[in-house]
Structure formats: C-alpha cells, structure tokens
Amino acid sequence: FGWPYFIGENRGYPYYDYATNTLHEENNPAKPLNKSVNNTGLTELPPAQPAFISYPYGVSDKFPEVGTGSRCAVGGPVYHQDDFKNAKRAFPAYYEGKWLAADLSRGWIMSISMDKNGNYKSMERFLPSYQAIEPIDIKFGPDGDLYVLEYGSNWFRKSDNAKLVRIEYNSGNRTPVVKAKASASGGALPFKVQLSSAGTIDYDG
C-alpha cells in the first residue's frame, strides 16, 4: 500500500535527492511525504498500510510456508460457492472465502484463510504436489474449475512448457494407483503364476 516509499511491513526507502546526489531520511509510514519535483498532487499522503503478506528471499519467520528464493507474488481469486451454483462441478465448501494466491518465481499456490474482517488467519499449500511453471494468472471459470496460466521457463521468448492448466475438483476418494505384476505371462499346462499388487497405493485408505 505504500510503494514506492515503503515495502513489506512498512520498511521505508530513503529519499534520494537527484539534484545533490544525497540520501535523506526514510519516509515516515504514519505521515509519508511525496517530495518529487514531478509531483502534481498531494505532498502529505495518507498513512501507509503494511502488506497483507510479505516475505524475504530467505526464510520467513512469519510465513515459513512460502519457502525461500526469488519472489514474485501473484494475486488470485477469493472463492465463493454462490458464484458457481449452476456449475457442473465446483470446489467444496472447505475453500469458501479463501484466497488463492501464487508466486511466479517459487511456483506454488497458497490457500489463504481470513477472518470475517479480512485479516490474515493462516495459509496452506494448495495441491502440494503441483509445481506450477511461472504462474502469472489464476482464475475460476464459469464451469467451476480453476485455471492457472503458466508463463513457462523462458523469459521474453517462446517457452515450450508454457500452458494453461485446468484444475477440476472431483468429490469422493482419490483414484488408487494400481500396480500389478505376474511372475510369468504364459506357459505350458498346468500353468502356475504368482500375482502381486505390491506398490499399489490407496491415498484414502
């Protein structure tokens, strides 16, 4: 809310005087001033508001879920079930009122919970197994599915892995991952074979 005078939780930038090439004191978030010679509006600005969620390149003590590395937050939608009453399929009530936000550089999508006044409560990884490739936009479609636009790995040129991803919600248990093995695929009678389902996974028991 205070950019370019402040960043994150109202950490101020010093004012730079280009005429004298000198740095001056940082702006006061309670009473920021626009001292630019190009300013055609107010000099005394409203109090700056700290960022709703902010995090550094390193580990965040306040938001450890976001990880580390380069950062580029991408805002997404707040989910409301009433918007999808006639949708073929819609996300469950669990996501009601939650904000989905991403980070282009880190490739995650977070599900962020807020209280009735819009204050931050908690966040959790949305689809932890899904690593988006430079997500630049997230929206719900009228069909109730979530669409994620991935920029891809290459900047300012063609990316073969750029794509539009559709994420649909399917109720009920997840499909098991089945692995079947046979000790032999054929032979003379009497044919004996040993069958195994080792490695089969049912995520929901």
What function would you assign to each model-found segment?
Residues 182-193:
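Short, solvent-exposed loop/linker segments at the N-terminal edge
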Residues 173-182:
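Proline-enriched interdomain boundary motifs that mark the N-terminal boundary
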